[in-house]
Amino acid sequence: MASNMDREMILADFQACTGIENIDEAITLLEQNNWDLVAAINGVIPQENGILQSEYGGETIPGPAFNPASHPASAPTSSSSSAFRPVMPSRQIVERQPRMLDFRVEYRDRNVDVVLEDTCTVGEIKQILENELQIPVSKMLLKGWKTGDVEDSTVLKSLHLPKNNSLYVLTPDLPPPSSSSHAGALQESLNQNFMLIITHREVQREYNLNFSGSSTIQEVKRNVYDLTSIPVRHQLWEGWPTSATDDSMCLAESGLSYPCHRLTVGRRSSPAQTREQSEEQITDVHMVSDSDGDDFEDATEFGVDDGEVFGMASSALRKSPMMPENAENEGDALLQFTAEFSSRYGDCHPVFFIGSLEAAFQEAFYVKARDRKLLAIYLHHDESVLTNVFCSQMLCAESIVSYLSQNFITWAWDLTKDSNRARFLTMCNRHFGSVVAQTIRTQKTDQFPLFLIIMGKRSSNEVLNVIQGNTTVDELMMRLMAAMEIFTAQQQEDIKDEDEREARENVKREQDEAYRLSLEADRAKREAHEREMAEQFRLEQIRKEQEEEREAIRLSLEQALPPEPKEENAEPVSKLRIRTPSGEFLERRFLASNKLQIVFDFVASKGFPWDEYKLLSTFPRRDVTQLDPNKSLLEVKLFPQETLFLEAKE
């Protein structure tokens, strides 16, 4: 039985030779032939490429034999009925459909997206960029090709490019924007961001890293250590400018190209180790010739070259881990997982939640019922032969990505390393119980990847479904939709319960508010009554004080009055009769020589102060209080007797 690594190599060779792009179909055909590469190719090529195969004893059609350069003409023959025989095409060979390639081209602070068929040339890309950037083709250097510099006449198909590509434009003949002084230029560079395109030589992987101009070369090397696990002292660099002689130098003054600069990093190693690693990546595929010595035609006749035949196998050997071993911080581990997943399978993939599993629970379950979602946990395993198929064909399908984004929170973990596997099983046992943990623990490698669908409940988290990697897009979508139906039914109940609970809480809040308003109204009435009583008390006190003051004044005036003269007196006597507003009369005798003020004091001593009342005489009618109080009664003609009236002043 072929190992997992051998299977990936066989699968890559089988797809390259047959041109079958559907990985599910390729695996099915290989499994039918017990992973025998030659038998599988013999069984597929007649149907897929329109080539007839001779039967036992059948008459062979005259024609030239297939003579690959790798087999001499004197090679021993075989009588196998499955051997390749000279054939003539019975129908037209199916032509390869042109691929659509996506290019993102960066120039200074602009990004231009270009989509072309792989039958186009590099020059056609430049023509499009000339219209977009207004830069003549003759002044333009298009960089970023993995194979180095290419000619404008190079056909894209011959470069064997992936679907998504990143390029950048350099214009060395065009003057860059000038600054007023060197200090100003340096300050401007310190504020700029440099894109460093760093190629990891051993694994043939590119990292696009952004650094500010104030970052140092040492900081770049430390960041590269975090990504490649190559210590700074073991890093072997290519591409630094000659002026970058000190690791403490900032990028702005190191002479890097702006906006992007290409660098290459590798591990310092002996030539013998390098040769040994190269030899381990070489894979030979031997075909069996028939009894007549006919050989299998070269793979280039099928439209693929050696790089396409062995590229997938070499790529598999150079894979970077999805997660660092013994990952301490789940957020950092998932950042690396997302970056590596994108580099392998493209940018069209589910949005993986960056954070701990507990944080994913909070995001999915511990919100309002209307905002809750299902939690999908993707468990990756690099050693499973199904991983590449599941990720590229199913998990990255646009329909799956869209459905997951709308209805799920997607969290991922890599179980390839034993330490990471043990850590996830611990989390699984804590959150889902020992039964689910044991189920995952007993899964075989070839049953991965797994897709767990989790629904949050009031007291626990329920695993609705465990989807294994040997599925199809339609089946995966059906199982996701089935889980969504269960979740929707539960969500409707939760929404109803939540609405009822919120209604009860609203009623309680309204009652509490009404009670509070009632208490405030009672308190306001009580405070108003208290203020009224206090005001009445204050006014009463003022009134009493005024009465006491008036009484004191009255008594003092009464005591200050001269004694009333007798009727028979040697001096002239004036008798005054004063009518009060109530109709009563006040009578008293005064000496004719007494001043008018004494009359006023007498009236005031009876409770009628002269500043509040006025004295009026009848004949003639006059206001006595307007007369001079220092004149005598005789002078004001209130002698020998007079009747006066008291009247309140207005």
Swiss-Prot record:
Subcellular locations according to the entry: Nucleus
GO BP term (any one): positive regulation of protein catabolic process
Pfam families documented for this protein: FAF1, UBA_4, UBX
Alphabetized Gene3D superfamilies for the sequence: DNA helicase RuvA subunit, C-terminal domain, Glutaredoxin, Phosphatidylinositol 3-kinase Catalytic Subunit, Chain A, domain 1
Subunit architecture: Interacts with CDT1 and ATPase VCP/p97. Interacts (via UBA domain) with FAS (via death domain). Interacts (via UBA domain) with NLRP12 (via DAPIN/PYRIN domain).
Function of the protein: Ubiquitin-binding protein. Required for the progression of DNA replication forks by targeting DNA replication licensing factor CDT1 for degradation. Potentiates but cannot initiate FAS-induced apoptosis.
InterPro entries given in the database record: FAF1-like_UBX, FAF1_2-like_UAS, FAF1_UBA, Thioredoxin-like_sf, UAS, Ubiquitin-like_domsf, UBX_dom, UBX_domain-protein
Residues recorded with modification Phosphoserine: 320, 582
Gene Ontology CC annotations of this record: CD95 death-inducing signaling complex; cytosol; endoplasmic reticulum; nuclear envelope; nucleoplasm; nucleus; ooplasm; perinuclear region of cytoplasm
Modified residue annotations for Phosphothreonine: 580
Residue stretches making up the UBA domain: 1-57
PROSITE patterns associated with the record: UBX
Protein name according to UniProt: FAS-associated factor 1
UniProt keyword list: Apoptosis, Nucleus, Phosphoprotein
Gene Ontology molecular functions: heat shock protein binding; NF-kappaB binding; protein domain specific binding; protein kinase binding; protein kinase regulator activity; ubiquitin binding; ubiquitin protein ligase binding
Residue stretches making up the UBX domain: 569-646
Region of interest (Disordered), residue spans: 62-87
Tissue and organ expression note: Most abundant in testis, slightly less abundant in skeletal muscle and heart, followed by prostate, thymus, ovary, small intestine, and colon. Not detected in the peripheral blood leukocytes.
Source species taxonomy: Eukaryota, Metazoa, Chordata, Craniata, Vertebrata
SMART domains linked to this entry: UAS, UBX
Gene: FAF1
